[in-house]
Design a protein with these regions (language model features):
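Short, Lys/Arg-enriched N-terminal segments with co-localized hydrophobic residues
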Residues: 3-22
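Generic structural hydrophobic/aromatic packing signal, biased to beta-strands
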Residues: 28, 38, 61-63, 94, ...
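Low-complexity intrinsically disordered segments
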Residues: 68-118
């Protein structure tokens, strides 16, 4: 959002850009107990790297509760798969992970990830 403000001393206008806040999505919990954080936004490993977009193509997964073979290739620290971030994971892969674990019981995902309820 951009808006203008007038400087009182010299009567000139200047523009202030207010950044949209990043949404923090609640941890995804699947039917079989599998858990993971799924986030997207300006300072995260997502496509696009912007806040509040209509649809993301790739998102960041963090700290899954167990090793998950579908996302291993995206791991930043593959030696400890439950204590790392998974960068630029395509949204269709996230949907497959949720489906593999029986669907989503609770949590939130960024726009673009298809929610499959348990």
């Amino acid at each position: 959002m951009t808006w203008a403000r007038r400087n009182r001393q010299n009567n000139n206008w200047y523009y202030i850009q207010q950044r949209e806040r990043a949404m923090i999505y609640k941890q995804v919990i699947c039917k079989d107990g599998f858990r993971m954080s799924v986030q997207a936004g300006e300072n995260l490993s997502s496509i696009p790297r912007q806040n509040s977009v209509e649809r993301y193509e790739a998102v960041e997964i963090g700290y899954p509760s167990e090793k998950e073979s579908l996302i291993l290739e995206y791991a930043e620290g593959p030696n400890d798969p439950t204590d790392t971030v998974y960068a630029y994971v395509p949204v269709h892969i996230v949907t497959l992970v949720i489906a593999k674990h029986g669907g989503m019981v609770s949590g939130e995902v960024p726009p673009g990830v298809i929610v499959l309820p348990a």
